[in-house]
Amino acid sequence: MAGGVGARVVVGRHIYGNLYGCDPQILRDESALITIIKEATKIANAMLLSVGSYRFGPNGGLTVFAIVAESHISIHTWPEYGFATVDVYTCGDHTDPKAAFDYIVSKLKPQKVEAFFGDRSMYKE
């Protein structure tokens, strides 16, 4: 049942957001974003399985992602607008997706953040 009715049998937490007014230089820095996403994985207490990235043109934005045993973490950037989106979804009581999200935000240094939370758990009556 949705909305947390009954006992939670599967734990899924999803925090995602829009970051405005980020430094375009860091949004173009593939190496820095990979380092940030690896550290965010540790902070979330998730098990890193793989990291990947894709650059959209020589000076364009990036998609950087971590596949973790518990789900995924991703950063998508639009440096020409100083804009990024961040997505952290983890399963399990042992993970802390908000801490990972907050860490990424601290590194991208946006002027404005819109954050959203989704409970993706399963509940049993």
From Swiss-Prot:
SUPFAM superfamilies: S-adenosylmethionine decarboxylase. GO terms for cellular component: cytosol. The keyword Isomerase does not apply. Its EC number is 4.1.1.50. Pfam families: AdoMet_dc. Keywords: Autocatalytic cleavage, Decarboxylase, Lyase, Polyamine biosynthesis, Pyruvate, S-adenosyl-L-methionine, Schiff base, Spermidine biosynthesis, Zymogen. GO terms for biological process: spermidine biosynthetic process. Pathway: Amine and polyamine biosynthesis; S-adenosylmethioninamine biosynthesis; S-adenosylmethioninamine from S-adenosyl-L-methionine: step 1/1. Binds 1 pyruvoyl group covalently per subunit. The record marks E70, S71 as: Cleavage (non-hydrolytic). The active site is at S71, H76, C91. The modification Pyruvic acid (Ser) is found at S71. Its cofactor is pyruvate. It catalyses: S-adenosyl-L-methionine + H(+) = S-adenosyl 3-(methylsulfanyl)propylamine + CO2. Signal peptide: none annotated. GO terms for molecular function: adenosylmethionine decarboxylase activity. Is synthesized initially as an inactive proenzyme. Formation of the active enzyme involves a self-maturation process in which the active site pyruvoyl group is generated from an internal serine residue via an autocatalytic post-translational modification. Two non-identical subunits are generated from the proenzyme in this reaction, and the pyruvate is formed at the N-terminus of the alpha chain, which is derived from the carboxyl end of the proenzyme. It comes from the Archaea. Belongs to the prokaryotic AdoMetDC family. Type 1 subfamily. PANTHER family: S-ADENOSYLMETHIONINE DECARBOXYLASE PROENZYME. Heterotetramer of two alpha and two beta chains arranged as a dimer of alpha/beta heterodimers. HAMAP family: AdoMetDC_1. This is S-adenosylmethionine decarboxylase proenzyme. It comes from Pyrobaculum islandicum (strain DSM 4184 / JCM 9189 / GEO3).
